[in-house]
């Protein structure tokens, strides 16, 4: 899988396609992230919302429970 960067510099001699692994290493640096990321928090919030939602009276097959 490759990532293509839009609006790449046309004078550039290297390919604008980079491997995700190299981008992850470049962005993470030597310090691992501490705590939850914003994606983690959003997923936790979504999971809590799903647990609070009432279940429908009909199952997926359309039969009453």
Swiss-Prot record:
GO terms for biological process: protein folding. Keywords: Crown gall tumor, Plasmid. The keyword Transmembrane helix does not apply. The keyword 4Fe-4S does not apply. InterPro entries: VirE1. It holds the Pfam family VirE1. Involved in DNA transformation; controls virE2 polymerization and prevents virE2 binding to DNA. The Ti plasmid contains at least six transcriptional units, designated vir loci, which are essential for efficient crown-gall tumorigenesis. Forms heterodimers with virE2 that prevent virE2 anarchic homopolymerization and binding to DNA. This is Protein virE1. The lineage of its organism: Bacteria, Pseudomonadati, Pseudomonadota, Alphaproteobacteria, Hyphomicrobiales.
């Amino acid at each position: 899988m490759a990532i293509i960067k839009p609006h790449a510099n046309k004078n550039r001699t290297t390919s604008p396609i980079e491997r995700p692994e190299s981008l992850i290493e470049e962005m993470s640096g030597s310090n691992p992230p501490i705590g939850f990321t914003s994606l983690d928090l959003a997923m936790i919030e979504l999971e809590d919302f799903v647990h609070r939602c009432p279940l429908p009276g009909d199952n997926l097959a359309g039969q009453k429970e």
